[in-house]
Amino acid sequence: MCPLFGHRDRGAGMGKILKLANFRKTIYYLKKNGIKNAFYAARERIDSEKEDSYCYQGLTEEEKERQRKEGESFSVRFSILVPVYETREDLLRAMIESVLTQTYGNFELILADASKSEEPEKVIASYQDKRILYKRIRQNGGISANTNQALMYATGDYAALLDHDDLLTEDALFAMAERIEQAKREDTELQMLYSDEDK
């Protein structure tokens, strides 16, 4: 059992397996691939649902300090682009704080706010960090258009996309910066990096 957030109880996903839609998929798979392959595929699916699926273990203080020190030698700068629209205060604060507590600090957080109310602006203004750039957008163009508005103000080497209610683990930017630095040593330029682990 994992005492940290993100834990799912053992076997909690069994209800998903036993749904009628999955039964139909199993019959289709059986007809297409035979009984032996269908049996092994079903067993693998059931076994994977029995396991503890999510168990995030945070960084130790020693690891955080190591990353901070190593990151000082990196040159890459990230522009984190966040479209904001009527975001609840608790979610907005959690997102901002997950960025500000990164072990790699060479970034700018660009918040493009298309909210009708002034509440998100007040929350953002309460943070006195020069890495935060707030831009008010007059017209809400949706997530893509608002993100493009934020991109217009980016000065970093890489643009990072983040939703207004997303969270980053403390080492998310460090992991990206470390990979970019490794590529530089290998005389390779990375055009894009992606991780679905840091949400």
Stretch-by-stretch model annotation:
Residues 28-98:
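N-proximal low-complexity "stem/linker" segments adjacent to membrane-targeting elements
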Residues 97-106:
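Short, acidic, metal-binding catalytic loop of nucleotide-sugar glycosyltransferases
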Residues 113-122, 139:
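A conserved acidic beta->alpha catalytic loop
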Residues 137-154:
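Glycine-rich, basic loop-to-helix element that forms the pyrophosphate-binding segment
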Residues 159:
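Short aromatic/hydrophobic "clamp" motif used to bind/position activated sugar donors
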Residues 163-167, 196:
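The conserved acidic donor/metal-binding loop of glycosyltransferases
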